[in-house]
């Protein structure tokens, strides 16, 4: 269980750092095109939740097992080669397969919605900072 939590936390950190906006993105948003805070938040949460819920099956971690010729099968192969012929229990591939087999898409959707909310708050705070600088 601890390894699943660590894996999910690492995924969160990876996605959190990728969600930061650049200055060009700030310029793209103008005051006329900005949404209200609530609807903007709902949009980010829906997109984040939808993408994360679809991520496991799209990568090949399905409820029936790892799909052939998918990224999941490549990860499984690399993991087996790196660990002397077997996929380690509790490793990244095993954890993602467990989430895919047990309906972890609902959990991933919740994490994605939380990440969407976090990205929305970052975008909103950066917009406020850029307005204050002007």
Curated annotation (Swiss-Prot):
Regions that span the bilayer: 7-23, 41-61, 75-95, 99-119
Keyword Transmembrane applies: yes
Pfam families found in the cross-reference section: Ifi-6-16
Gene Ontology BP annotations: apoptotic process; cellular response to virus; defense response to virus; innate immune response; intrinsic apoptotic signaling pathway; negative regulation of apoptotic process; negative regulation of extrinsic apoptotic signaling pathway in absence of ligand; negative regulation of mitochondrial depolarization
Keyword Electron transport: no
Assembly with partners or alone: Interacts with CIB1; the interaction is direct. Interacts with the chaperone BIP/HSPA5. Interacts with RIGI.
The protein's name in its UniProt record: Interferon alpha-inducible protein 6
Organism this protein belongs to: Bos taurus (Bovine)
